[in-house]
Amino acid sequence: MNFSVIFAVGIGGFFGAISRFLIATWMQKITHSLFPVGTLTVNVLGSFIIGFLYMYFEQSINPIYKAMFITGFLGALTTFSTFSLETLLMIQDGLWIRAFLNILLNVILTISSTFAAIILFKKMYGGL
């Protein structure tokens, strides 16, 4: 493994984690919601960005940038573990509908967001 790639992943992860904290906290604060809208926001945003970057990086770009942005930044920005914990806590509190809605929204919106980004990229820059 190349040290430059490892370093790039670390740098991307640093900024992704900070971004996740700031975005999720801000979204939760402005919505005043009991629903974990902050986690949903970073997951949907990250899914959109990964769809766009997937298409961009297919156009042959330095693999260090791909590792930094996809593995590092987006790996730290999105958060399946927080989504899992929040859903489990809802279930434990008997909030079954909210838990189901959380699962449904995270799955449908993240996949749709990635798909939308790929379509947008193709419209903007042409397909592969």
From Swiss-Prot:
One of its GO terms (molecular function) is fluoride channel activity. GO terms for cellular component: plasma membrane. The chain crosses the membrane at residues 3-23, 34-54, 69-89, 100-120. Pfam families: CRCB. It is a multi-pass membrane protein. Belongs to the fluoride channel Fluc/FEX (TC 1.A.43) family. This is Fluoride-specific ion channel FluC.
